[in-house]
């Protein structure tokens, strides 16, 4: 492209290189602009160049950006007009390892969309939420979580023209295993204090928790989960949005209510409460926990609408997988609709410490 450039004709610039860096901190670029008196107008739309192509392999010993840091960052980045494509990304961060592929593309309206598929190996959950500012939501924060996280994540995240993430537009699906974990002072769990002693619910420790999850339309969907702990044996399902509105459906075996750790239900529970017999002589109490606005409430799940939540989850899951497959080919075609859920086993497996 250089001869055309010298002649004054439009020409694409092509770069191929290997880059090695001891330390990289993108925030220092802005500091240098401020030191030289250059204007930093953050309201200007960010536009990717239309006449640039490059392939760069990179090795970065230390990467820092705001509250996030990583070591031994390696990978390759390819750029063609309006598309950054990062492949074979590998880095050590958050006390573990992260690897995967991702891309960022600019739309015709100057907005952006990011897409990625990542694998996580033994990263610290609390440090992750702290580094990413709780991912822009308030319903579960760093102080509510503890443990080591491994798993996989497929993600679509839109950005506006200023490269600000649009959290409400996030679409994601993944599988994870949390080891040596804890759920601490989590409000929906604390609402069960009418039935379980509050001291048992403040911090719930578990040895291992395995599950899949997905996020769409501003909701985190939680399929049925069997929880066995020293606090109680529960079955939980529900959904939780990023504005901290939630609806959970909880099933507690009535035999648990006779133990010393659980409070007895209000009088006339069997007459007015919602109970269920599993056919084996084990009767369960059905509860519903709802929070809309600032007020949370626990009630008997008389209509057992947990079944409707379960159906909603199945529908949203199929829709999500279609989106990820049709737009980015993240899943094989036969895995989107043909695969039937296992009706015998819950999607969650929780192994609790004795």
Where do the protein language model's features map onto the residues?
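Small-residue helix/turn framework positions
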Residues: 1, 10-34, 49-64, 74-78, ...
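Surface-exposed edge beta-strands and adjoining flexible/disordered loops or tails in beta-rich
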Residues: 3-5, 16-18, 304-312
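Intrinsically disordered, low-complexity segments enriched in small/polar residues
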Residues: 31-47, 351
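Gram-negative outer-membrane assembly/targeting C-terminal domains
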Residues: 295-354
């Amino acid at each position: 492209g250089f001869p055309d450039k010298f002649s004054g004709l439009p020409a694409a610039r092509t770069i191929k290189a290997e880059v090695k860096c001891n330390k990289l901190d993108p925030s220092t670029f802005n500091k240098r602009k401020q030191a030289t008196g250059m204007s930093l107008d953050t309201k200007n739309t960010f536009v990717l160049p239309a006449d640039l192509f490059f392939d760069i392999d990179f090795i970065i010993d230390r990467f820092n950006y705001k509250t996030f840091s990583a070591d031994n960052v390696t990978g390759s980045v390819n750029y063609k007009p309006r598309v950054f494509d990062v492949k074979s990304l590998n880095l050590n961060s958050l006390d573990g390892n992260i690897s995967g592929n991702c891309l960022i593309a600019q739309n015709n309206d100057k907005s952006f969309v990011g897409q990625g598929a990542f694998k996580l190996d033994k990263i610290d959950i609390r440090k992750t939420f702290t580094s990413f500012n709780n991912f822009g939501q308030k319903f579960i924060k760093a102080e509510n979580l503890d443990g080591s996280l491994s798993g996989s994540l497929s993600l679509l995240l839109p950005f506006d023209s200023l490269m600000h993430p649009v959290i409400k537009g996030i679409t994601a699906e993944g599988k994870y295993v949390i080891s040596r974990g804890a759920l601490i002072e989590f409000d929906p769990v604390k609402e069960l204090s009418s039935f379980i002693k509050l001291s048992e619910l403040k911090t719930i420790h578990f040895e291992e928790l395995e599950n899949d999850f997905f996020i769409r339309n501003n909701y985190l969907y939680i399929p049925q989960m069997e929880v066995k702990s020293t606090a109680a044996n529960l079955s939980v399902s529900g959904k939780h949005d990023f504005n901290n509105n939630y609806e959970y459906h909880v099933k507690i075996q009535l035999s648990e209510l006779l133990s010393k750790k659980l409070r007895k239900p209000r009088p006339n529970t069997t007459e007015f409460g919602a109970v269920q017999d599993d056919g084996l002589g084990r009767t369960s109490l059905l509860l519903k926990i709802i929070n809309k606005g600032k007020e949370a409430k626990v009630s008997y799940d008389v209509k057992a609408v947990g079944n409707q939540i379960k159906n909603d989850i199945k529908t949203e899951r199929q829709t999500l997988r279609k989106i990820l497959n049709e737009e980015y080919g993240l899943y094989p075609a036969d895995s989107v609709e043909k695969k039937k859920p296992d009706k015998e086993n819950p999607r969650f497996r929780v192994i609790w410490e004795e």
